[in-house]
Amino acid sequence: MARKKVQRKLDGWKSKEWYNIEAPAYLNRAIVGNTMAGDPSLLVGRNIETTVGELTNDMTKNNTKVILRINNVVGDVATTDLMGHELTTDYIRSIVKRQTSRIDANIDVKTKDGYIIRVKPTCFTIKRARSSQIKAIREMMVNIVAKRASEADFETFMQEAILGRLSAAIYRQAKFIYPLRRVEIRKTQVEAAPAPAASAAPEPAAA
């Protein structure tokens, strides 16, 4: 009986194939890993975690996690959608200092092409700020993020959020309210994608 169980396991492994997991085109179609499956359709919907460092071959950026979701399998390649990113807890702890203020915001924004994204920007001040300054900086963060999302498509906005251009835009304006030490987009998460466009109704036949 034991031999039969072992043989069934071996047969199961033999029936599976390897699939490369590919990042989206705007993330350079980097291969972020591989997995085995007997039925490739079972891979669809699976979340994959990687880092910006692995996507760009820059190990200094391994403190930024990127979440991808498999959306299709073509041949031996599993393609993915970007679902968001998050800075590691250790990295956030490393930039928190005493006698300073940490200012967090949590905002749902809509991109020009209809994606709903939850964005969590964070500012770190040089010294402790007053409550009125904290409120003003938080409002400015929210306004900058919402405005940029409304102007950009999904791919552009997510690249700016993950690679630091959005946080730099916040820093340039918010530092005039109170001196800032650092600004980060701590997390993004795709909440909803636009519905597929309905196909045009056929024109009525000529009488």
Curated annotation (Swiss-Prot):
<dbReference type="GO" id="GO:1990904">
    <property type="term" value="C:ribonucleoprotein complex"/>
</dbReference>
<dbReference type="GO" id="GO:0003735">
    <property type="term" value="F:structural constituent of ribosome"/>
</dbReference>
<dbReference type="InterPro" id="IPR001593">
    <property type="entry name" value="Ribosomal_eS1"/>
</dbReference>
<dbReference type="GO" id="GO:0005840">
    <property type="term" value="C:ribosome"/>
</dbReference>
<keyword id="KW-0689">Ribosomal protein</keyword>
<dbReference type="InterPro" id="IPR030838">
    <property type="entry name" value="Ribosomal_eS1_arc"/>
</dbReference>
<dbReference type="Pfam" id="PF01015">
    <property type="entry name" value="Ribosomal_S3Ae"/>
</dbReference>
<dbReference type="GO" id="GO:0006412">
    <property type="term" value="P:translation"/>
</dbReference>
<comment type="similarity">
    <text>Belongs to the eukaryotic ribosomal protein eS1 family.</text>
</comment>
<dbReference type="InterPro" id="IPR018281">
    <property type="entry name" value="Ribosomal_eS1_CS"/>
</dbReference>
<protein>
    <recommendedName>
        <fullName>Small ribosomal subunit protein eS1</fullName>
    </recommendedName>
</protein>
<keyword id="KW-0687">Ribonucleoprotein</keyword>
